[in-house]
Amino acid sequence: MFAELAEVAAAQLGPYPSLPGPELRRAARAAMGVLDLAAGDVRVERSWTDGDLAGEELSWSVGFGPRTHAYLLRPRDAAGPLPGVVALHCHGGMKWVGKEKIADGPSVPSPGPSLEVQRVRERLYGGRAYANELARRGFVVLAPDVLTWGSRRFPLGVDEPGPYDAAARDHEHVVAKYCAALGTSFAGVAAGEDLAAAAYLRSRPDVGTVGCVGLSGGGLRAALLGAFDPDMRAVVVAAMVSSYRDMIDGYVEKHTWMLWPPGLPRLGDWPDLVAARAPEPLMVQYALRDELFPEPGMRRAHTMIEERYREAPDAYEAVWADVPHSFDVTRQEQAFDWLAQRLKA
């Protein structure tokens, strides 16, 4: 039935046009209802040192819901402004925590990350907290929670990680409905929160140019930051790019509502928005054994992005790897080196 519906919609609505980048960015921001938010009343909740790193747990208000908590990590003895990176946690089917999936805070090494977090890291991140590793390379790294994760999660009446995550899977449908009823979208609210985090990082006197990086749902968030923040100097999207049209048959239900903001297909395909920042630097990592995206969709996306970067081919870096859905240590190191080239120049 969906295949037949797709044919009717294609004939009548003509989805996936190819708008110019600046026009697409403006139209997509309006269609998604991206909120204009700011990180207000920023507080340092805790600070610590961990060997060669210094860390802070920050909190701020975006104007609704519980305060956003974030980890800020930087080299302990660094002098002068350093390039900044917003490190964006994934969806991962785990909403009990957000930033902890990619960043170690003050509780490490004792008692250390939870067993649930360790499993996510082993499955997706090569077993390590990549935000801390990135900070050790000479970056100021900000890892914030976002709506429905960690400090920004909803009170669902469940106090254990496993049962909470099960409840949160169904509750995401409710969140998406409320956002639509209010004229925004799940993606639009998340993008607004991430834009606020990036603006805060950029405002710090110890931070210079700013980029962002994320895997999966974090890669989606990185792509939206790249599209909607004109001062985002370099963007890494890991295992989160395929054409919509190649996902219709069997892949739609595997993904968060954030990937399907209402109205976007009337403006362009997902790779069009990912590449709408052209000619600004973009790295996309494709996992050829990704169970969440079809290889033909990744191949089509790469061709589409290459076309949008036709006049600046050196600004687009495609990384192909015969791996499952992940941002493993090898791919992390490639991203770190690329971010250093783009942000430290």
Give residue ranges: language-model regions.
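N-terminal targeting or regulatory segments adjacent to alpha/beta-hydrolase or S9 domains
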Residues: 1-56, 62, 98, 137, ...
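A short loop-to-beta-strand scaffold at the N-terminal edge of the catalytic core in hydrolase folds
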Residues: 55-59, 64-76
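Mobile cap/lid helix-loop segments that gate and shape the active-site cleft of serine hydrolases
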Residues: 174-184, 196-197, 234-274, 292-302, ...
